[in-house]
């Protein structure tokens, strides 16, 4: 029993150490990975590939799409399927800003969203989580309309 308790405590200590490991890559490399992942995510819309879109979502993702937040990968994919139903993409996006926590496990990407004619119609913000080495997935995503204000 004592050996089991020691093994359990040792395992917990080891896991706690892993959870707080510092970034194992440079911050610039991490930012580049997230930006590249965001561009690949956006390419899924241009390529009309809903399965590729789904591959970028964490299982417990939350998207602020529509009147209430969508919780979970399945709900997000079901809601977003309508954006992939037509031959032409209804919008496009690209990252302009990327920031990564010092811990290296969470990142923010944000940028413009354009309609098919290239007009800025919205801005997005996505929170990415590093779920495996070199594997970033979205945990939160939210868009916001832009003002079409005239001076």
Task: Tell what function each PLM region has.
Residues 6-16:
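Bacterial N-terminal signal peptides
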Residues 18-55, 62-151:
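A beta-strand edge to alpha-helix "cap/lid" segment located at domain peripheries
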Residues 1-4:
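Positively charged n-region of N-terminal signal peptides that target proteins for export
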């Amino acid at each position: 029993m004592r050996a089991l308790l020691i093994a359990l405590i040792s395992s917990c200590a080891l896991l706690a150490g892993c959870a707080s490991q510092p970034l194992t890559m440079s911050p610039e490399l991490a930012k580049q990975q997230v930006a590249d992942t965001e561009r690949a995510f956006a390419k899924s819309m241009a390529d009309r590939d809903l399965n590729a879109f789904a591959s970028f979502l964490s299982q417990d993702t939350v998207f602020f799409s529509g009147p209430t937040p969508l919780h979970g990968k399945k709900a997000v994919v079901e809601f977003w399927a309508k954006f992939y139903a037509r031959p032409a993409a209804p919008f496009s996006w690209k990252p302009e800003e990327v920031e990564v926590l010092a811990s290296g496990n969470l990142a923010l990407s944000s940028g413009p969203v354009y309609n098919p004619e290239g007009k800025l119609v919205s801005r997005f913000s996505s929170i990415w989580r590093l779920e495996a080495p070199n594997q970033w997935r979205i945990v939160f995503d939210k868009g916001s309309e832009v003002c079409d204000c005239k001076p």
